[in-house]
Structure formats: structure tokens, C-alpha cells
Amino acid sequence: MTGFTGSAGNLLVTKQDARLFVDSRYYLQAEQQIAGSGILLMKEGLPGVPSLSQFILETLPGQTLGLDGRCVSLDQAKAWAKAVTVVDVDLISPLWQDRPALFTGAAFRLADHLAGRTAQDKLRDLRSQLKAAGAKAMLLTDLMDCAWLLNIRGQDIPHTPVVRMFVLAEAESLFLFMEDKAAAPIQAYLKELGAEIRPYDAVYAFLSRYGAGDTLLVTPSLSFALGQPLLERGVQLTESAWSARSRNFKTPGELKAIREAHIKDGVVMTRFLRWVKEQGGTGLDEAGAAARLDQMRLAAGCSDISFTTISAYGPNAALPHYSAPAQGSAKLEKKGLYLVDSGGQWPGATTDITRTVAMGPLTRAEKAHCTLVVRAMLALMDAAFPRGMDGSHVDVFARRPLWAAGLNYGHGTGHGVGAMLSVHEGPARINYGQQNTLPFQPGIVISDEPGLYFEGDHGVRMENLVECVELPTGMLGFVPLTMAPIDRDVLDPALMEPIDIRRLDAYHALVYDALSPYLHGEDLDYLENATQAL
């Protein structure tokens, strides 16, 4: 409809105009991609720019709002219904007649030692939730919840190993709504769980078994298409975040797999960083660099990348979620900054790492900004804080060095990460602008990724995944999971405090100890040099 290829955005079309609403990650990208289309760009978060919800509530009262109820949550639709009449209608399918069919791949069982808990154990916990709430069933609609609960993974969504399905669990029954092609390889296992397989689209009619007086536990992402008919029949819907919160706290088995995967991922990244720093001026472009890194991960035993690799040179790195075109992407030169944000799906684990490296000489501003971002990442990684604090509180550890310099960035500092699931896993997050997120507890895996972006010039981001742990003092803190060198060529030590240098040296000592047994020749030489004390 728009030509915008970002992963998040909303299009509102009225008789008068069309407006694309995006957050700060996509301001520049959306501006470029819809230029000349006549579509108005709404940069949510900027002063004076209403959010999509504000715009609907303030400018469309009394009107009728059509939406695809499968793609909008019940909560969101109910909020809009205070001002407009909401109608569930699919207006896109009649227009998009050559739309590719949804892909269905074979599902597979995740080994119990990787999951750390059996599906039977999780189902017992789920049913205890039903009993406590006096509910007849729990309906899971989030694909990550479904995969986590059943200890299965799939191939239905690019780079996110989930199965397209719904799970409906009652006290004595378990119904899975999924395609036969996906279920076939694990039929025997699903039978062990007592599951009855139904067609994916049959869920809408099947839910008619519930009526007035029944209570269903539902996930916060329940769609309008599923939830509204239940409400109209008098079913009591009670939101439950049990599954999402449970999978945020990784089991010992999951953490073991995650730590092992980060060693393998770090070996790949170190080999790539050595190679790419030698490619300035050779004709290598952003797309070619990304392809090389993706191939290296797959060759090392990764089943898939965890998201489309962000490979950005020079001014393109100022777009936080830049996507290099397959043809005609920028060539890496012997100067300036190159940013690569990438990750993989390893057995039982998902990785996500960003490094910004010097391809040659840097300007004073580029070095200053890189130094600030590294200081920010290390400060959060070394933070100590009491129990009860969430991501809106600890964000200040990362942003303080930047704020002191009069700088900031528009995206969150951290997002939860799944265990061979989605690279973005809620409700854990680090963002001072989002209150009441999941309080930190040991076992949460989250990213630490501050950045700075200067339109038309350069961008910097550094990212490690970290694990929340209890410190010897009894406070909570983080330990790094990501193991890969931070390019010292981007740093100006004169702009670092002694504590910053100690933190960097300590991290690099960990990286060397973790990776050196698995690297040889030029790669080991590079690691030794890259992790020398500053």
C-alpha cells in the first residue's frame, strides 16, 4: 500500500488523505520510501505529532473505522470504540490478488534439556492458573507463547522459529489449531500431550462452545476478531500474562544453551569483524557484507538468522533499522564507520549483537560519539540495583553519559530475547519512556544497545545481550552473554573515565578467555590484539 518496508508502522486511510504512523526507528526510512506518494508521514513521539490512537480519538469521533480484526488487538479496538464505530473488515485481500500464500513448514520438537522444562510440566502450571481463576480454558494466541508452552519450534515465520497456531487448553483437554503439514512430523509427541489437532481457521467457530457465565483466560494480544464475538456472547475474558512472563525467566537448561550459543556466535562475529575491517576500498558493499556474515553463521551450525541483518555504512547507519538493497547498496570505503546488527537461531538460543567498527580514519565527532556509546553500554552492563526495579528505572545507567553530553536516542535501550524464539520478546524491556514493564529478576535475558544517530552523516550502536543475575551484594545486575571484541579503533581513551577503561578491559578479558580456544591463525591474532588492555 505504501512502499514502506519497515517492520512496524500503521496506515490510516480516510476519504481526504492517507497517513503512515511510524516511531523514531523509521523516521528517515519512511520519509525516503514514501516520498512523492502523497502519503502523509506521522512521526510518532515528536512534539505536536499525535499517535495513531490520539489521531483516531481526536479527529474521527462519530465515524466508522474499518480494520482487519485479525491484526488489531481487542484492547486496542475497544479503546478506539469509545470514539468511533469499529467494523471488522478485510479491505486488502480483494486488492492484493497476487498475494503469496502463507508458508507452512514442518514443526519440530525442542529437546527437553534445551527447554529446561517438559511441556507436561508447563501444562500442569497452566491448569493451576485455570483453577485459581475459576476459568474454563486458556486461549494462547501469541505464537511465541504457543511454541514455548509445547516445547516445539517451526518454520512458518521468517527468522522466528514458530508455528502458526492457536492453543486452547481446558482442565482435561488440549486443542491445537494448526495446519496438518506442520503437525505431521510431531504427531506422536502431540498425542503424548493429549492434544487434539484442528484446522487453523476452525478456531473461530470452535470458540462458540463458550457462552454467558464462562470465563476464559486470554493473552493481552488477543485479536479483535477472536475476542469480540466472545464478548458479545457474554463470555468473561480475563487477561493473563502467565505464559509471556514465564518464558521471560529462562530456566537453567535454557541459560546453558544460551551461553553455549553465544560462544559459537562470538567465534563467527570475531572472524567476520577481522575480515570486514580489511575490506574497505575493495568494492565490497553492504549487501555483500551481510550475505557473508549470514553464510558464516549458517556454516557454523545456526539454523537461521534471527532477523534480517542490518549492514550499514556511513550515513546509512543513521537509520537505526536500515535495510541494504540487494542491488546498489553502499560500498565500504577505507574511512568512516560500518555498523552491523545481526543474530542467529541456534539450538535452544537466539542471539543479537551490534558492532560499529572503523573502516579507516575517523573524524573527531565519530570517535567522540562511538566513545560515548561504548561508555553507555558498559555502564548498564556493570549496573547494580535493588529488586523491584524495571527497565524504566535502569535505563538511566545507559543514558546518563549521553545526557551529560546533551545527546539522546529515540529507541529503547533494551528488549527481551527469546530462547530460540523471537529476537524481540516482551514484556521485559529497557526504556525510560515505558512505565510498568516487567521487574527484573534473575534469568531475564535482555539487550543492552545504546546508540547515536546523525542524519546524513553517521550512526553508532553497540549491543550486547546480558543476563540478569543476583550479585554477591544481594543486589541485581547483569553479566554479558555476548562475546565479541569492541573495536578499539573507534575509541578516544582521552574521553573515557578510568572506570570506563576498567570495564572495557574486564569485558575484553572475558571475551578472550571465552573465544581463544576456538580461533586460530589470523583470527586468533586479531582476537589477541582486539582484546588487549586499553
What feature does the model see in each segment?
Residues 1-534:
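Active-site neighborhoods and metal-handling regions in enzymes and metal-associated proteins
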